[in-house]
């Protein structure tokens, strides 16, 4: 359960019918995907269409990474509250 707070569902494969069975992606994996996207976006030979598609994908990765970071912070705050009560 605890690990689920820090993972998001990876994009399902084309043949995957059930998103619940999709593997989870960690915060670090999202950040790595963002780093790769930034590297590719810096390619002067990247077409406008490919650049826009990559940008949209990168923004989705960013949102998911931010959600994981927020979940981690909320869990941290919860633990701090429990420590103060003890």
Curated annotation (Swiss-Prot):
| Primary location | cytoplasm
Q: Which first-to-last residue range defines the signal peptide?
A: none
Q: Which reaction does it catalyse?
A: Exonucleolytic cleavage in either 5'- to 3'- or 3'- to 5'-direction to yield nucleoside 5'-phosphates
What are the record keywords, sorted? Answer: Cytoplasm, Exonuclease, Hydrolase, Nuclease
Name the GO cellular-component terms. cytoplasm; exodeoxyribonuclease VII complex
Cystine pairs annotated here are none
Q: For the region Disordered, what residue ranges are annotated?
A: 1-26
Q: What class of enzyme is it?
A: hydrolase
Reported EC number(s) for this entry are: 3.1.11.6
Q: Spell out the molecular function terms from Gene Ontology.
A: exodeoxyribonuclease VII activity
In which family does this protein belong, per the annotation?
Answer: Belongs to the XseB family.
Known role: Bidirectionally degrades single-stranded DNA into large acid-insoluble oligonucleotides, which are then degraded further into small acid-soluble oligonucleotides.
NCBIfam families the UniProt entry points to? PRK14065.1, xseB
Q: What is this protein called?
A: Exodeoxyribonuclease 7 small subunit
């Amino acid at each position: 359960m605890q690990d689920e707070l820090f993972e998001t569902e990876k994009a399902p494969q084309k043949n995957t019918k059930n998103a619940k069975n999709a593997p989870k992606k960690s915060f670090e994996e999202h950040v790595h995907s963002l780093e790769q996207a930034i590297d590719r976006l810096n390619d002067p030979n990247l077409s406008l269409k490919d650049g826009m598609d990559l940008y949209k994908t990168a923004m989705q990765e960013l949102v998911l990474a931010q959600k994981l970071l927020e979940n981690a912070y909320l869990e941290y705050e919860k633990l701090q509250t429990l420590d103060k009560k003890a």
